[in-house]
Regions:
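Small/polar-residue-enriched beta-strand and adjacent coil segments characteristic
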Residues: 21, 60-74, 78-157, 280-356
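Periplasmic alpha-helical coiled-coil/stalk elements that build and connect Gram-negative outer-membrane
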Residues: 20, 50, 153, 157-271, ...
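Regulatory alphaC helix of protein kinase catalytic domains
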Residues: 10-26
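Short loop-to-helix capping motifs
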Residues: 29-35, 245, 274-278
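Acidic, low-complexity, intrinsically disordered peripheral segments
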Residues: 7-14, 67-75, 79-87, 422-459
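Alpha-helical heptad-repeat coiled-coil segments that mediate oligomerization/polymerization in large
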Residues: 207, 360, 367, 402-406
Length: 459
């Protein structure tokens, strides 16, 4: 693709692109980010769980009922009884035996089947109220509440991460587009010099070697321009996907820099130690460990439960009510060991908190120093930019006067594009370092405030 064709395609793309300021891009990302949506859903799920166990330990009232029908058969063997009846007469006095022999005694059947069948129904209402469970219900509620706080910390961390990702892709697209524009301008200018060198060769002003050097420089400029074009296209796709745009996106907020130092290091360390979601997550983990320990201790205490049940029927209904007490005196499980283990988990969480505070403070300091270094680097490159511009002017005048060659001018313009690109890269380094610093301090939402404070815009 030639320079003219690329310029036409870029113009068409800009006309159809969605123009977004950084704040607009952030709002769009927050509304459409699947990562943030997943984090919010996780928080809502934990909050619902916490709400679900809010009344844990209260009374439980239930109603039960049954209906039944039965049919029962019992088969009786009467042969032994018949035999006994037959033997009764021989054991009586002779006078009675004669009388009985004249009276017919009925014979029982060999067997007889008894049948019982009936239908019925029963209903009752029951209530159970744990009066004291040793603190187990409070431990469960506290554990679920701590899980909700952990999910909230994860959601806050996800918010900081997507903010930093947006800065990377938004201003990365700005940098890539600026680099492509500078490389395109260099390609156009060097193309003109290449054409002029061809005419100078035909006129015998320069040698064939000088002509080939100009052609090689032009080919290198073309390769650099095409690479920068592809990089800009890829950066644009990444930005569009981040903000969930159907087509391309044109960033409207330029790379920026605050020439004066920002707040001191202590400001960001203090903010990090109170706002960093990583510390909130560690605190939630510690609370969970504490509640697990309380749950273990609750199993060592007595449990008192009130209960009652009553038949649902009119008249004289059956009912029962009472109190139940349970206290485990001996258990095959070593409760002391389990209690010590849960206490160790609390100690582990405390140590993790101390380590996290140290790591976060170090991370904040590293990012703060990287930001200040990027600021200094950008400001110090001003001399390099001015030098590159002056060299281009000098080589242009020298070419007219015959004191410079076409290759000298091409080298000067190539170097100018390189220096301008490097300075834009330094501005992007500053912006990315600022985003990293704010994320590590838990202040990502204040990024736009620093855009408003910027006194240097890299257009």
């Amino acid at each position: 693709m030639g320079a003219a064709a690329f310029a036409q395609q870029q113009a068409r793309g800009d006309a159809n692109a969605l123009a977004l300021s950084f704040d607009a891009a952030r709002l769009r990302m927050v509304e459409r980010s699947d990562k943030l949506a997943a984090a919010r859903i996780a928080v809502e799920a934990k909050e619902l769980q916490s709400e679900g166990v809010k009344r844990l330990g209260g009374p439980v009232v239930s109603i039960s009922g049954l209906a039944y029908a039965y049919n029962a058969n019992l088969n009786l063997d009467l042969d032994p009884l018949n035999q006994k009846l037959g033997q009764i007469g021989s054991s009586l006095p002779p006078s009675i035996q004669g009388f009985i022999s004249r009276v017919p005694i009925p014979q029982l059947p060999n067997s007889y089947t008894l049948n019982r069948h009936d239908t019925g129904a029963n209903a009752s209402v029951s209530a159970v109220w744990p009066l004291y469970l040793g603190g187990a219900t409070d431990a469960v509620r506290g554990f679920v509440s701590a899980q909700a706080r952990e999910a909230q910390a994860d959601a806050e961390q996800a918010g900081h991460e997507v903010d930093t990702l947006l800065v990377q892709r938004y201003f990365g697209a700005q940098l890539a587009q600026r680099a492509a524009t500078l490389r395109l301008q260099a390609e156009r200018t060097i193309a003109q010099h290449d054409a002029a060198a061809q005419k100078m060769l035909a006129a015998g002003v320069i040698s064939r070697v000088e002509r080939l050097q100009a052609s090689a420089a032009y080919e290198e400029a073309r390769r650099n321009a095409r690479k920068a074009e592809n990089d800009a296209a890829l950066a644009g796709v990444a930005l569009a996907r981040t903000v969930r745009a159907e087509g391309s996106v044109t960033p409207q907020t330029p790379l920026f820099l605050i020439s004066a130092p920002i707040e001191p290091l202590g400001h960001f360390i203090d903010a990090a130690l109170t706002r960093h979601p990583g510390l909130g997550k560690v605190a939630a983990k510690k609370a969970q460990a504490e509640q697990l320990h309380e749950g273990e201790e609750a199993l060592r205490r007595p449990q008192v439960i009130a209960f009652g049940t009553r038949e649902i029927k009119s008249g004289n209904a059956d009912w029962v009510a009472g109190l139940g007490v349970r206290w485990t005196l001996y258990d095959s499980v070593d409760r002391n060991a389990l209690s010590a283990a849960s206490h160790k988990q609390v100690e582990q969480a405390e140590r993790t908190d101390l380590q996290a505070r140290s790591d976060i403070s170090l991370l904040v300091e590293r990012n703060w120093r990287a930001l200040d270094n990027a600021r200094r680097q950008y400001l110090e490159m001003k001399v390099s930019v001015e030098l590159a511009q002056e060299v281009v002017k000098l080589r242009t005048a020298g070419l007219r006067e015959g004191t410079s060659t076409t290759l000298d001018l091409i080298d000067a313009e190539t170097n100018q594009a390189k220096v301008l690109t490097e300075r834009a890269q330094a501005a992007n380094d500053y912006v990315q370092a600022l985003a990293q610093l704010l994320e590590s301090a838990g202040l990502s939402e204040t990024f736009s405030d620093y855009i408003a404070r910027a006194d240097v815009k890299v257009n």
